[in-house]
Curated annotation (Swiss-Prot):
Gene: infA2
Functional note: One of the essential components for the initiation of protein synthesis. Stabilizes the binding of IF-2 and IF-3 on the 30S subunit to which N-formylmethionyl-tRNA(fMet) subsequently binds. Helps modulate mRNA selection, yielding the 30S pre-initiation complex (PIC). Upon addition of the 50S ribosomal subunit IF-1, IF-2 and IF-3 are released leaving the mature 70S translation initiation complex.
One GO cellular component term: cytosol
Family: Belongs to the IF-1 family.
S1-like domain boundaries: 1-72
Organism superkingdom: Bacteria
Keyword match Protease: no
Protein name per UniProt: Translation initiation factor IF-1 2
Length: 72
């Protein structure tokens, strides 16, 4: 899957789950399961409930995603 195929959406972190997974609520009301991207993990960026984040979704599975950016 190339970089062009991903869907980027903004959302709000609702809860922390084990193994660096998060439940993220999208503006349309859907909730997705998201994990942290490698760059965020590498730079020790903390993600807490209530944070606004950008999530990349695959067009093949819209229930899972990757957190690629945390807004300040």
């Amino acid at each position: 899957m190339s970089k062009d195929d991903v869907i980027e959406v903004e959302g709000t972190v609702v809860e922390n789950l084990p193994n660096a997974m998060f439940r993220v609520e999208l503006p349309n009301g859907h909730r997705v399961l998201a994990h942290v991207s490698g760059k965020i993990r590498m730079h020790f960026i903390r993600i807490l409930p209530g944070d606004r984040v950008t999530v990349e979704l695959s067009p093949y599975d819209l229930t899972r995603g990757r957190i690629v950016y945390r807004y300040k």
